[in-house]
Amino acid sequence: MLDIKVIRENLDWSKKKLATRGIKPEELDKLVAIDKERREALTKSEQLKQKRNEVSDQIAQAKRNKEDASDAIKAMREVGKEIKDLDKEVEDLTQKQNYILLRLPNFPADSDPIGPDESYNEEVRKWHEPTKLDFEPKPHWEIGTELNILDWDTAAKVSGARFVYYKGAGALLERAVSNFFLDENTKDGYTEVIPPYLVNDASMQGTGQFPKFTEDVYTIVDNDDPDKPRDLTLIPTAEVPLVNYFRGKILDGEQLPINVTAFSPAFRSEAGSAGRDTRGLIRMHEFRKVEMVKIVDEESSWDELEKLTHNAEHLLQKLGLPYHVVALSTGDASFTSAKTYDLEVWMPAQDKYREISSCSNCTDFQARRSLIRYRDENGKLHLAHTLNGSGLAVGRTVAAILENYQNEDGTVNVPEALQPYMHGMKVITKEPKFGE
C-alpha cells in the first residue's frame, strides 16, 4: 500500500508515476479530497475531545465547590454527541480512503522502462545463445506424452483442463528439479521453510493479492453455505505465507537481510487466460514452484534485488539452459512491484523465450500493508522492504529441460547437475504404461 502522506505532499509526481501504471489522475484527486475531509474531521474531533476534558475538569471542580454544573453537563453531552458523529465520519472516510489505497499499485522505479505492456520490456543481458538442434524440435507436451512421463488426458478426466499427471521418470525429474533448487538456494544463504498452503484474507491482502485479484485464486467455501466463502484461500505462490510470516513483527535491523525459500504447490484460476497456452506446462491451474523471499532494510533493497536475480540466474546456468533477463515495463510489472526482472528461458520448439522467474523489489509496499518493521541501531522503527522471486517455477523448468535436452530419437538427456538427484539416470527413455 502506498503512503497517503507521500501522495498528498507530492500529488503531481504521484499522478505522473501512477499514470504509467494505468491509474487516472482523477483517482488520486478523489483520494486526496477524501483524505483532506478525513483529516479535518479528525482534527475537529480531537479539539472537541480536548474541550470535553477541560469542561469535565470544570464540572468536577464545580461539584467540589457545591456549585450548579447543570449547564456545563448539558453542554458536555452535546459535545459528546458531536464527537461520536465525527468519529463515525472519520471511520467512514478512512474506509473510503483505504478502499482506493488498497487498489493502487506500487510506484514504479525511475529505471523502469515506461510503456503500457510487455512490448516495452527491455533486455538487460543474455546468457548463452539459444539452443540449436539439427532436427525439428518437438514441443515438451509431445515429448512428455510420447515418453509416457506426462499425461494430460487422464488429468483432464480426473480434474479438468490445465492439470497433468507426472509419471515415472517425469515424476522423478520434477522432484529432482525442486530438490536441486532448494539445495542451491540454501547454499546461497536462504533458510528453507515449509509453509501452510491455505492462508487467510488478511495474508492475501498483506501481499497484495486481495482485494484487487480475488478472481485469480481459489477460495475455500463453507460446505453449509456454498455462497459464503471461508476465510481461507489456496496460495497462488509461496510468497504469500513467506512474507506474512513476518506480518505485524518488529525485526532487529542487525539481523537483516532475512532470506527464506520454500517449495510449494501454487493454485491459480488463470482468469483472463482463455485460449492462451492451452497445451503443456506453461500455464496450469496447479503447479509446483520454489520461491525466494528477502526481508531487507530500505537502504539495501536495490542491491538485494540484484542478488536475488543472480540467485535465480545461477540455477538456470547450473542446468545449462539459455535465458535472458528482461526489465519489465511500468505497464507489465506486477501490482506490488517497484521493479521486476523477468528471467525467460529459451524454448526451442516455440522458438522464443518464456518466463520462468520474476524477481521483484516491492520496496515498502507490502510491509506497509502487513506492518513489517525493523528497529535500526538507534532504536528508530522503519518499514522493511520485501523482495520475492521464483527460484524457479518447477513445471516450466521441466518443460525447458525436455525441449532443450531432447534427442532426435525422442529420448531426453538429463542435465549433469540433476543426475545425482535422479539415481544416476543420464537419459530419459519411454516409460511403460500402467497395466498395458
Curated annotation (Swiss-Prot):
Gene3D superfamilies given in the database record: Bira Bifunctional Protein, Domain 2, Serine-tRNA synthetase, tRNA binding domain
Annotated EC: 6.1.1.11
Amino-acid positions noted as binding L-serine in the UniProt annotation, renumbered to this chain: 237-239, 291, 390
GO annotation, cellular component aspect: cytoplasm
PROSITE patterns linked to this entry: AA_TRNA_LIGASE_II
Keyword annotations of the record: Aminoacyl-tRNA synthetase, ATP-binding, Cytoplasm, Ligase, Nucleotide-binding, Protein biosynthesis
Pathway(s) this gene product operates in, as recorded in its UniProt entry: Aminoacyl-tRNA biosynthesis; selenocysteinyl-tRNA(Sec) biosynthesis; L-seryl-tRNA(Sec) from L-serine and tRNA(Sec): step 1/1
Pfam families: Seryl_tRNA_N (PF02403), tRNA-synt_2b (PF00587)
Stored InterPro entries: aa-tRNA-synt_IIb, aa-tRNA-synth_II, aa-tRNA-synth_II/BPL/LPL, Ser-tRNA-ligase_type_1, Ser-tRNA-synth_1_N, SerRS_1_N_sf, SerRS_core, tRNA-bd_arm
Catalytic activity reported: tRNA(Ser) + L-serine + ATP = L-seryl-tRNA(Ser) + AMP + diphosphate + H(+); tRNA(Sec) + L-serine + ATP = L-seryl-tRNA(Sec) + AMP + diphosphate + H(+)
Keyword Nucleotide-binding: yes
Disordered as annotated region, ranges: 43-68
Molecular function in Gene Ontology: ATP binding; catalytic activity, acting on a protein; serine-tRNA ligase activity; transferase activity
Any one GO BP annotation for this protein: selenocysteine biosynthetic process
Family recorded in the similarity comment: Belongs to the class-II aminoacyl-tRNA synthetase family. Type-1 seryl-tRNA synthetase subfamily.
Subunit-structure text: Homodimer. The tRNA molecule binds across the dimer.
Domain notes: Consists of two distinct domains, a catalytic core and a N-terminal extension that is involved in tRNA binding.
Protein name from the UniProt record: Serine--tRNA ligase
